[in-house]
Amino acid sequence: MVDAITEFVVGKIGNYLIEEASMFMAVKEDLEELKTELTCIHGYLKDVEAREREDEVSKEWSKLVLDFAYDVEDVLDTYHLKLEERSQRRGLRRLTNKIGRKMDAYSIVDDIRILKRRILDITRKRETYGIGGLKEPQGGGNTSSLRVRQLRRARSVDQEEVVVGLEDDAKILLEKLLDYEEKNRFIISIFGMGGLGKTALARKLYNSRDVKERFEYRAWTYVSQEYKTGDILMRIIRSLGMTSGEELEKIRKFAEEELEVYLYGLLEGKKYLVVVDDIWEREAWDSLKRALPCNHEGSRVIITTRIKAVAEGVDGRFYAHKLRFLTFEESWELFEQRAFRNIQRKDEDLLKTGKEMVQKCRGLPLCIVVLAGLLSRKTPSEWNDVCNSLWRRLKDDSIHVAPIVFDLSFKELRHESKLCFLYLSIFPEDYEIDLEKLIHLLVAEGFIQGDEEMMMEDVARYYIEELIDRSLLEAVRRERGKVMSCRIHDLLRDVAIKKSKELNFVNVYNDHVAQHSSTTCRREVVHHQFKRYSSEKRKNKRMRSFLYFGEFDHLVGLDFETLKLLRVLDFGSLWLPFKINGDLIHLRYLGIDGNSINDFDIAAIISKLRFLQTLFVSDNYFIEETIDLRKLTSLRHVIGNFFGGLLIGDVANLQTLTSISFDSWNKLKPELLINLRDLGISEMSRSKERRVHVSWASLTKLESLRVLKLATPTEVHLSLESEEAVRSMDVISRSLESVTLVGITFEEDPMPFLQKMPRLEDLILLSCNYSGKMSVSEQGFGRLRKLDLLMRSLDELQIEEEAMPNLIELEISVSKRETKLIIPNRLRAFGQIYC
């Protein structure tokens, strides 16, 4: 486990040697020697892992190595900080820089020599403790792209959630959901121990076509052990999709009772389905039920819980359904579907070994799929190694195999994937994790290395998808064939928290207690109120990351003058001070909730963060002042509503730019944005005299663009047949996967052009107008998976029988109700049509 940290630090030394070309020779030589020694120590750590040495001596030695690796990182980051602070000085003070740099070099040489003495002591103790048999680090020397290619070969194709052994349960519960004679609000409780598949069964019901057709209003929310009723109510309101973004920001400030009244009003008189996943206390249901009308529309509520008393403790009409363990035959079927993906020939010995291990899983689906994910990447001969490892740890039948399987699966991960898994411990229980945000955080932390073939974000996505493929992480939402959000099962989250604690990796604070508290921990995370955290007044100068997931609160007690090594700041809903003191040279990620900005001098602060990679400002805030990003040449993602002007320089690595005004976009130099993948251009002015101009020529350089959104509250006339548009769109259409157009009035039918885009998977036309007929030919939209046409006006829409062969989601709504629709019946079955 410690090997993940040491390999990360070894990589950091290597990167530092490359980046600091002007480094003094003495510093360079000492660092190279230190890197060699730490690489060697890393090999012995791998040996400790491989031999499964868990004696106190090995643990003590591993702890020495862990502390040493962290101290190496501190020395490097502090030295880099001093160099950057000197490089920013101007005027006469520059004359002293040369002397200062030499003094800094002498200082780090002294620090490194102390570290070298320590590593010699660590080596002597290794020999004394008898830790030998050097094992080379796995994947050493491979480039990121090569490791990803190896992962890609081992990955399965996109797999829908497999539900084995629950077919009868699903049939019974579906009948309860669709019972037309039951007009009252009816509650279905699914209960059983963790890992049995309660959430999987509930999701199967929630996503079934019959349920979608029956319930126009559906919502899903998680509860968990540490819940706030107001948060749960807000999640239900958001999930229903009945409330505008502007309205959502208003009701975020409501008290709990006001939210109850608001949600009740939304659902009154409607046939709804609400899934409340993972309830631990009856009080949680008592807090929610007042907001869910007991109407006579045939509404339903599904509850999942581990506790029988909670399942049967709901009032009103209900049905409690207990999930059972899988039979051996069902267990083997589930295992076979996942474990044999890369094995062509299954001999008798292999089958026997597999069945012995599956038997030990005792019918627990989560244990079975994690075991299958572990074995699916191994050769038949390696199956015996896993089996032997299980037997060594299972001293008697009273020990459950699940924790052992989870631990083995973690140990088999590459160090990058281990760091990704550990990082999942920062998120609250049952939290739906936005995958793009997770990727941006992992890159900002320095855990991911790219190369000339692959961007760091692509590498990070593959490591996360490896966790999904191994069933260590669950995909929740997909778009365009990609995972967009994920969730970690609470049993696996417990594993991540336990290992993070052992590695001094994360401090997590909640209302009750810090799950792990240390003044030298790298990351500090607050899940609920900030007051408890700030009241302890700890000073952790080694902190690299601070993240806040709690409710609205004031930021007090964080002294940024002493936190100069910070790489990640995600303030969440904290009310920010007027300014942040200190030069945060190492900062790579800054996340801000718009409701918390107030007098925060966002423009002045952002412009100083020269090495920032990701700037995220939540979409509930419109930045109307000009933001100067010209010195921020490392930017990769700029996310927010920047309508006051955005000054951008040479940012070749910029991949995300959402959203800026049309005027700001037209002033940029798109030829510098060669890696831009996601672009959002929006106009906020509602003036009818205001004419918005789309410069199509500005898009011709964006050959990497995948997602394009153009939005305006005023009517913008758009032609896709002008010479400029045709020339520009011919370039970007080759890469586009998603197009969203809002408030556009088309001068001609856009479909003949849009349907030819070879990679287009999502098309959304919202509040658009076209006075004519839209036609989709038989060969049109070959890869399209989602089509939303929410038009203000449209005379006619015709889709030929063979068009859109891959469509799985369809919604058509036209305010002008006399629209003529000619749509194949097979497509009508995929969605909702209101015309």
Curated annotation (Swiss-Prot):
Keywords: ATP-binding, Coiled coil, Hypersensitive response, Nucleotide-binding, Plant defense, Repeat. One of its GO terms (cellular component) is cytoplasm. GO terms for molecular function: ADP binding; ATP binding. Changing E181D: In strain: cv. Nd-1. The keyword Repeat applies. InterPro entries: Apaf_helical, Disease_R_plants, LRR_dom_sf, LRR_R13L4/SHOC2-like, NB-ARC, P-loop_NTPase, RX-like_CC, Rx_N. Changing N641Q: In strain: cv. RLD. Changing F530V: In strain: cv. RLD. Residues 25-41 form a coiled coil. CDD domains: RX-CC_like. Disease resistance protein. Resistance proteins guard the plant against pathogens that contain an appropriate avirulence protein via an indirect interaction with this avirulence protein. That triggers a defense system including the hypersensitive response, which restricts the pathogen growth. In contrast to other resistance proteins, it works independently of ESD1 and NSD1 proteins and does not require the accumulation of salicylic acid, suggesting the existence of an independent signaling pathway. The specificity to avirulence proteins differs in the different cultivars. Belongs to the disease resistance NB-LRR family. RPP13 subfamily. PANTHER family: DISEASE RESISTANCE PROTEIN RP, DISEASE RESISTANCE PROTEIN RPP13-RELATED. This is Disease resistance protein RPP13. The gene is RPP13.
